Amino acid sequence: MAAVSVFQAPVGGFSFDNCRRNAVLEADFAKKGFKLPKARKTGTTIAGVVYKDGIVLGADTRATEGMVVADKNCSKIHFISPNIYCCGAGTAADTDMTTQLISSNLELHSLTTGRLPRVVTANRMLKQMLFRYQGYIGAALVLGGVDVTGPHLYSIYPHGSTDKLPYVTMGSGSLAAMAVFEDKFRPDMEEEEAKKLVSEAIAAGIFNDLGSGSNIDLCVISKSKLDFLRPYSVPNKKGTRFGRYRCEKGTTAVLTEKVTPLELEVLEEIVQTMDTS
């Protein structure tokens, strides 16, 4: 492979060889009655913001399976370490298992060093793992925490790239949430301001994206405390039933009634006795 790369002149631009390969495979599968698998559609709104004393993370609670709401109240804010939490978007199994694995590795790191892990350490572990799998692990993450160097907030993409920003959003409802952040964010906010801002951002994702919905969960991390607010608010409250919606028997008049007996022929009858001894 190295010899080929040495003797071949580099060619600029994009390579569309895989596109032609996929077209040939699709045509071949179509002849045999098969279809190529489609990409999994996922839906979530997760967000985080840095305030004066720490981090506020937020997420909705709807889990979808295609166009079906599979779970109305699932938790998308995952424990990494006592001072670090992580919101997950994408494939639910991938986000769960990825955060559990990194949490376990960070616990071993903490036991070895004798101190709480830094947020940058968790970020490095996550990005290296996701890059190793080249995007096949469908986990888009918002990592936040507070360590000896202060509050830190990262967005981690499924292919392993990361950003460190004062406010981040990810998921299918991220555009609506980002619009709220860009309009109302300001540096050095108080805790209540930050909680309200993240709640409004998640609510924007819930009301503008079908893949997001149900409740709003928040996680507030500072040097002095950790608050896991589940739920922080319920923007989609179920309506109250004020009465019975079934008609009483006899409400609808029966004009005619016809009963047709079924004539069945018993071909075989098997009787099994139950052992009562």
Curated annotation (Swiss-Prot):
CDD domains: proteasome_beta_type_7. Keywords: Cytoplasm, Hydrolase, Nucleus, Protease, Proteasome, Threonine protease, Zymogen. It is an enzyme of class 3 (hydrolase). Its main location: cytoplasm. Pfam families: Pr_beta_C, Proteasome. The active site is at 44 (nucleophile). InterPro entries: Ntn_hydrolases_N, Pept_T1A_subB, Proteasome_bsu_C, Proteasome_bsu_CS, Proteasome_sua/b, Proteasome_suB-type. The keyword Protease applies. GO terms for cellular component: cytoplasm; cytosol; nucleus; proteasome complex; proteasome core complex; proteasome core complex, beta-subunit complex. The keyword Hydrolase applies. GO terms for biological process: proteasome-mediated ubiquitin-dependent protein catabolic process. It is found in: Cytoplasm; Nucleus. Its EC number is 3.4.25.1. GO terms for molecular function: endopeptidase activity; threonine-type endopeptidase activity. Residues 1-43 form a propeptide. Coiled coil: none annotated. Disulfide bonds: none annotated. It catalyses: Cleavage of peptide bonds with very broad specificity. Belongs to the peptidase T1B family. The 26S proteasome consists of a 20S proteasome core and two 19S regulatory subunits. The 20S proteasome core is a barrel-shaped complex made of 28 subunits that are arranged in four stacked rings. The two outer rings are each formed by seven alpha subunits, and the two inner rings are formed by seven beta subunits. The proteolytic activity is exerted by three beta-subunits PSMB5, PSMB6 and PSMB7. Component of the 20S core proteasome complex involved in the proteolytic degradation of most intracellular proteins. This complex plays numerous essential roles within the cell by associating with different regulatory particles. Associated with two 19S regulatory particles, forms the 26S proteasome and thus participates in the ATP-dependent degradation of ubiquitinated proteins. This is Proteasome subunit beta type-7. The gene is Psmb7.
